[in-house]
Regions:
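A nucleotide- and high-energy phosphate-metabolite-utilizing enzyme signature
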Residues: 1-388
Length: 388
């Protein structure tokens, strides 16, 4: 595993070998390795619990987060959820051993995204999962399910889990407090970043990776009810789908993708340098590490400006751009995302369209619907195309 991971790391670093991996190839290679490694971990766990005895349960491992979305970094934790039939003591022991083996040999395996978090049962039946999400799940838990995929174990059971829960994900925007819940979750994430780290935080801070991800996920959850093309796992794929369907303007969308991929590049390079999971830039005084990061990320010094200066200037622009676009898409009533699409194009009845406007944060959806219908009817085809 570690040899294979080292090969992926070397092949993703321009200048190390003649044929480096592209940014599109890297996640595919990493996820193939992760799935294979964790399938092996599950086989070891089953052997430890059952020995030579027949296996009397079905256990599916559901990948969540970056692993579920096939967006793994070089050094990532792997979020998982377990579903078993029956969910008895041996299934729980297998899941527990799977986590131990995975953590010792491969990745930090984390099952905290399961129903009720760390206080909840490690393993549940499919029926128990469905009951939980129908009755007690919070909005953020449906948001987390955007990234789920059956990874290993009993894949038919994993597919049944997906078939049962996916419809609930795409109905989540009907919840009365949906928009405010998602926005509050983003604010809580920001509050976890210490003041002295805010300017160095690539992932959680203002203008960071999470700003892009939250904006994209909000749009997916709102518009994905009626548009299945938006039901993508990876952030960049989802953003491309939002652009293609007209929910995000082409210029804004292309800019977000470029900025997001730049931050991901810095994150990848940081992990290569430190050989650990991190998304925090070096301290300003650590010029040696900053210089390495700048060079590894493709920056070369100029006559009057160092590679560090150029990297930091680019990073400032990226953060400002992400922050501006995040506010436009995430905190304002999303008129810009809806106005280009008529009710017929959205394939919604008037009542369903008003319901969607309510989910978007409009206090008077009936009035907003009237304005949008008038705008859509009055806009020429040429004007719509030019606005995209």
């Amino acid at each position: 595993f570690h040899i294979a991971l080292s090969v992926i790391e070397m092949r993703s670093n321009d200048g190390v070998i003649p044929e480096p991996l592209s940014s599109e190839q890297l996640p595919d290679k990493a996820i193939m390795l992760a799935d294979a490694a964790l399938t092996a971990a599950l086989a070891v766990a089953v052997r430890q619990v059952y020995g030579d005895n027949p296996v009397d349960c079905r256990l599916a491992v559901i990948a969540m987060g970056k692993c579920g979305a096939k967006e793994l970094n070089y050094i990532s934790d792997v979020d998982v959820v377990f579903v078993a039939e029956p969910a008895e003591s041996k299934a729980t022991r297998v899941a527990s051993e799977f986590i131990k083996v995975g953590c010792r040999a491969f990745f930090d395996v984390d099952a905290a995204l399961r129903p009720e978090g760390k206080r909840g049962a490690l393993v549940r039946t499919l029926e128990s999962h469905v009951t939980y999400y129908r009755r007690w799940a919070h909005t953020w838990e449906f948001q987390a399910l955007l990234k789920h995929r059956p990874m290993t174990g009993c894949l038919p059971l994993g597919e049944a889990y997906s078939a049962a829960l996916s419809p609930m994900v795409w109905e989540a925007s009907k919840r009365d407090s949906f928009v405010s819940d998602v926005q509050a979750m983003r604010r809580r994430v920001l509050e976890t970043v210490p003041d002295h780290l805010k300017h160095r935080e690539l992932k959680l801070g203002v203008g960071g990776l999470r700003d892009v991800e939250f904006a994209v996920q909000l749009l997916q959850l709102v518009h994905g009810r009626s548009d299945e093309s938006l039901r993508q796992l990876a952030t960049v794929d989802a953003l491309a789908a939002l652009i293609g369907a007209g929910y995000v303007g082409r210029t804004d969308g292309a800019s977000l993708i470029e900025c997001y991929e730049f931050l991901r590049l810095l994150e990848h390079r940081l992990q290569l340098q430190k050989v650990k999971r991190t998304h925090t830039l070096p301290e300003d005084s650590d010029t040696q590490t900053l210089r390495w990061l700048a060079h590894a990320s493709g920056f070369s010094g100029e006559k009057h400006r160092s590679s560090i200066d150029l990297m930091e200037e680019t990073l400032r622009k990226v953060r400002l751009n992400i922050s501006s676009l995040h506010s436009k898409l995430f905190y304002r009533p999303l008129l810009d995302s809806v106005v280009n699409m008529s009710v017929d194009e959205l394939k919604l009845s008037p009542d369903a369209a008003k319901e969607q406007l309510r989910a978007l944060g409009y206090n008077y959806p009936d009035r907003a619907f009237e304005h949008l219908t008038a705008l859509a009817a009055g806009a020429s085809r040429k004007a719509k195309i030019q606005a995209m």
